[in-house]
Amino acid sequence: MKKFLAIFLAILMVATLAACGGGGETPETPDAPDATEAPVAGEVHGIKVEAYATMTADDLIAKLIKDKTAPTVEEYTALMETIELAELDERFNFADNATNDALIQLNSDGATLPNILDCANAVIANDSAKVRAYYYSRLGNVFFDDTTAYYAPIKAKVISETEPIAIAYAFRYLASNFRSDAEFCDFVLANKDNENFMVRKWFSSAVTFLQPADKTPFIDAMLELLGDEDVDVVTEAALNCGTLEDDRLVEPLAKILKDENLADAHDDALTSLIRMWYDYPAHDNYSEAAYKATMDYLKGDYASADLPSWLGLSKMANKGTKFDAWAAEATYVNNDEIVEAAKNIFEDEAKARLVRTQCISIIGVFGDKADLEALQATIDKVESASDKSSYQSKLDAELAKK
């Protein structure tokens, strides 16, 4: 009986030690994320949305990653999937969140990160459009083409997307990778009239990268978007349509520039027009119609001190190494006309400093030394010391180039 009792006590002691982990405590490590676990509303990988809202990057890394110096593909995927818990506004901007902070921190800490393409199969199968969209944004930093194993499955998922956020993010971040793919181009075109304004907005961004067999339907779509009911859509279309280099776009761009209620779109509309005829620094474009529309804008009379748009004007305030060769072919350009228009704007005391400063540079590009020196009398009359200093500095810099 005593022998039996001794054996029983020995077995009990071994079992107790095993349960306690031996003589000392072992730090807890996170379980590997289970990709097969059933989704729970408001919860991702055991993290509830309420808890996520207060989590830091360190908290999230500690929760999901065993070795933060070398996260596995599964762990890295799980980390990206927590973006489902982040807040998102109507413009598809994520609020500051622990997911993004954690990914940035891992990178800045020098962790050995998995190839993000290796996360593709898991992420594109995720039911959350937010998660897929976020993944597309991360893929935007990676080059991959049809020689890459993941190209086909990623494209197949992208062109089947129906959720606005996933479509918009694919347009914004993946158009470069799929630029020559006929199916992707068809997918983009099919969404030109999407009810969501952000999809329509990023449609025009995608078009700047695409290389379809026929650009005509895309130009037609851009013509429609330049008259869209949403200002954000119009502004983005105005910025990007110049890359299409089609004179049919000149008239709607000029119409935007004639409307001071669309002043927020003037920067972009003027940028596109100038690209079509001046195209700094490449100097490869020669649209006479775009030049004439630009000059009409510069000669316009505007109530706002900020018009004409200084940022748009800046696109013709410098010249590249091909300027002389371009100028020899751009016979439609009248340097005297440009100088006169810029001079008139500069002499208008009601115009903002940035607008007037750009005009000095424009005269430096298209005028001669005498044209620049003629500005001195106006500068001498400027009452604001800071404005006068700014104009004088710019004038001196331009004169130094002559």
Which residues are covered by each model-predicted region?
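Structural detector for internal amphipathic alpha-helices that build alpha-solenoid repeat scaffolds
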Residues: 47-52, 58-70, 74, 78-81, ...
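Amphipathic alpha-helical scaffolding segments comprising HEAT/armadillo-like alpha-solenoid repeats
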Residues: 57-58, 71-89, 110-123, 144-159, ...
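Positively charged n-region of N-terminal signal peptides that target proteins for export
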Residues: 1-4
